[in-house]
Amino acid sequence: MNKTVVVAMSGGVDSSVVAYLLKNYTSYKVLGLFMKNWEEEDGEGLCSTAKDYEDVEKVAGQLDIPYYTVSFAKEYRERVFSRFLTGYSEGYTPNPDVLCNREIKFDLLQKKVRELGGDFLATGHYCRVSPDENGVNLLRGIDPQKDQSYFLCGTRKESLENVIFPLGDKTKTEVRSIAAQAGLATAQKRDSTGICFIGKRPFKSFLEKFVPNLEGNIVDYDSQRVVGHHEGAHYYTIGQRRGLDLGGSEKPCYVVGKDMEKNIVYIVRGEDHPLLYQTELTARELNWFVSPKSITTCSAKVRYRSNDEECEILLRGEDEVLVRFASPVKAITPGQAIAFYDGERCLGGGVIEISMTPQSV
């Protein structure tokens, strides 16, 4: 009997192509599953859920596959969104996509797949998995511009054992071409960007609905002079340049730290200011695809679009590591995910813990 694969269909071109490839080029029985994580009334229609569902219906109809819907809105609010708000209110910059993958897509959605009689879950992530005697390895996607292994660095290893990533060996250009040649309804649909529950609204106008404004000072760290004012230190991220609205200097200003107790945002002037760079950090909430005891040196990404940075890892108990970089790294942000790599293989990841007040190299 042919095995069943359930495709997580978002209404976008990537998951549409996944369903198309599995339907037409494998022997699997293919089902579609649309996952709703946000109630539109919760956020004044911030997510285009209705339009996305219509696109799932169209593509499923084109491919002649059955499709289902599941809502994890309550669980998403409890396990992802609440942590997002708590993190920001405490001055961190959490990554909800990493949390969503771990808590929703590769946990609750996996359970729904089994309820539907599925043997495998397939998604449109640009990454790969490779089994060996120790389980499954998470590998980068071959398209360096679209590789999404970073977002899965916090996902439990066992959650990836029955997962298929058909786009891991393809580029975005190839995926668009496949969609166009197949005449899929989503072939020309734009990629979604940013955080789903924020949509197209400015980040500040969204966050202030949940975390109250609190006016405070913007301080030049070098001179300790007040150079401006803000409506909440939680709106600012280490390394941020835009939105400061500070004049009086030929050099651009960057956020270099925050004092959440005093509600102060610290800035420095110049993109090469030494306080913007760090040589080490602590990571917690660790998740490993290999034994951390086997790792001494590796590379790391401190944010999605950052370069790989060579580093060494020093274990500090069960759920903490000290990461020392070979060269200073700019704008390390507390609360963001850090992913560790050995070449194309993702070794694991964690959450960055670093002082929010400026620290010299």
Curated annotation (Swiss-Prot):
Q: Provide the alphabetized UniProt keywords.
A: ATP-binding, Cytoplasm, Disulfide bond, Nucleotide-binding, RNA-binding, Transferase, tRNA processing, tRNA-binding
Site label Interaction with tRNA, positions? H125, Q336
* Keyword Transmembrane applies: no
Task: Name the principal localization, coarsely classed.
Answer: cytoplasm
- Gene3D superfamilies reported for this sequence: Adenine nucleotide alpha hydrolases-like domains, HUPs, Translation factors
Instruction: Provide the residue positions that the database annotates as binding ATP.
Output: A8, M9, S10, G11, G12, V13, D14, S15, M35, G124
> Where are the disulfide bridges?
C100-C196
The domain of life for this entry's organism is Bacteria
Would the keyword Chaperone turn up in this protein's UniProt record? Answer: no
Locations listed in the record: Cytoplasm
Q: Name one GO cellular component term.
A: cytoplasm
Q: What is its EC number?
A: 2.8.1.13
Outline the segment boundaries, as ranges, of region: Interaction with target base in tRNA: 95-97
**Which residues constitute the catalytic centre?**
C100, C196
Question: Which GO biological process entries does UniProt record here?
Answer: tRNA wobble position uridine thiolation
Show the catalytic activity.
S-sulfanyl-L-cysteinyl-[protein] + uridine(34) in tRNA + AH2 + ATP = 2-thiouridine(34) in tRNA + L-cysteinyl-[protein] + A + AMP + diphosphate + H(+)
What this chain does, per the record? Catalyzes the 2-thiolation of uridine at the wobble position (U34) of tRNA, leading to the formation of s(2)U34.
What is stated as this protein's family in its record?
Answer: Belongs to the MnmA/TRMU family.
Name of the protein in question: tRNA-specific 2-thiouridylase MnmA
Q: Which organism is it from?
A: Chlamydia felis (strain Fe/C-56)
